[in-house]
């Protein structure tokens, strides 16, 4: 006679998997356990967790092994080499057995009840489900944004709503953890052309044929750990070039719709360059690498001069601007204070003119 555990395992294996939570990870041994802890107790017989490790050099394998041993619906695949985030997420969908795949980051948290809410939404049989997310600081102790989109109620998109979906959700889709997509939809679309874009999910969603049925869940289902992205060192390149080039590459959306998502050439905007200088993401190194031969003579001179502005001065001015004129920008203030460009003067400003409810906002970021 089979033991109870053997019977339970047999029952799980015989259940059709409805939802696969798909994580692509690399070198996140310091944080991935928190992410897994937020997921595993929500797993049900018809839900699995698939983790693809792109050859992490740290202790990720040993950490995940504990979860594989304890939870039958957790699967771990370690690749021999790192193929990049896009290809690794594509692999997670390939390994998945669920009808739907939730593309989950390896450092954020799934909110309590999230899987149950998504399983309920799956009953509507949409091709695509997108979920709202809240944003918190690195240790999750403070909320920076309660909602990334500001949309208060669930929204449904049908045939003919592709451009509305694009404008409503384009910016939100910079966060891959918002995406739950039907696996057959993902598999029959061109993914290879988006390898290296860092946003394979966006390419899959907005290529032709258009998504004809989508749902946006307005209640946050994920908590984002702000400032912990693997791509932090490439921030300027990503937001000035890779992201806008991807958005403006889609031929089936109007130019005004694309502009609502992102400017095609944000690097031409002097205020955008100053903001990046204030956050320590733009310097003469980026000018030399990306802008020295780009644009008009005026563009080149302007970008060069901005690179000469002391980063600490740019940061102080930016913090002053936020605490006096943008007092709802909690995330913007935290981002500035968390920068290496922030000095005691910037932190003094934040303490002296705190945003509403944020008297200790400066204490959650680094201070020099």
Language-model-derived ranges and their functions:
Residues 2-245:
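Nucleotide-sugar donor-binding/catalytic module of glycosyltransferases
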Residues 203-206, 210, 216-368:
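C-terminal subregions of glycosyltransferases and related glycan-biosynthesis enzymes
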């Amino acid at each position: 006679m089979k033991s109870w555990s053997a019977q339970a395992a047999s029952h799980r294996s015989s259940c059709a998997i409805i939802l696969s939570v798909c994580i692509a990870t690399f070198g996140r041994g310091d944080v991935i356990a928190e992410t897994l802890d937020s997921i595993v107790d929500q797993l049900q017989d018809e839900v699995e967790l698939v983790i693809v490790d792109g050859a992490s050099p740290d202790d990720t394998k040993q950490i995940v092994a504990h979860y594989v041993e304890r939870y039958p619906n957790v699967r771990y695949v370690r690749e021999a080499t790192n193929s990049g985030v896009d290809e690794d997420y594509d692999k997670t969908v390939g390994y998945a057995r669920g009808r739907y795949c939730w593309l989950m980051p390896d450092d954020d948290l799934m909110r309590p009840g999230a899987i149950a809410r998504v399983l309920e939404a799956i009953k509507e049989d949409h091709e695509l489900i997108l979920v709202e997310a809240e944003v918190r600081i690195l240790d999750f102790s403070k909320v920076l944004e309660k909602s990334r989109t500001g949309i208060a109620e669930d929204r449904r998109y049908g045939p003919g709503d592709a451009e509305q979906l694009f404008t409503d959700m384009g910016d939100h889709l910079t966060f891959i953890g918002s995406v739950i997509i039907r696996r057959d939809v993902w598999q029959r679309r061109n993914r290879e052309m988006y390898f290296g874009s860092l946003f394979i999910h966006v390419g899959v969603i907005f290529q032709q044929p258009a998504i004809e049925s989508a749902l946006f869940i307005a209640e946050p289902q994920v908590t984002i750990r702000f400032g912990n992205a693997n791509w932090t060192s490439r921030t300027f390149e990503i937001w000035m070039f890779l992201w806008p080039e991807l958005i403006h590459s889609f031929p089936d959306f109007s130019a005004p719709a694309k502009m609502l998502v992102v400017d095609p050439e944000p690097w031409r905007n002097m205020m955008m360059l100053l903001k990046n200088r204030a956050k320590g993401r733009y310097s003469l190194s980026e000018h030399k690498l990306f802008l020295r031969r780009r644009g008009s003579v005026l563009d080149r001179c302007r970008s060069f001069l901005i690179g000469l502005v002391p980063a600490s001065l740019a940061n102080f001015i930016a913090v002053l601007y936020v605490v006096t004129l943008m007092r709802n920008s909690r995330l913007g203030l935290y981002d500035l204070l968390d920068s290496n460009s922030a000095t005691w003067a910037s932190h003094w400003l934040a303490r002296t003119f705190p945003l509403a409810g944020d008297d200790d906002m400066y204490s959650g970021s680094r201070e020099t």
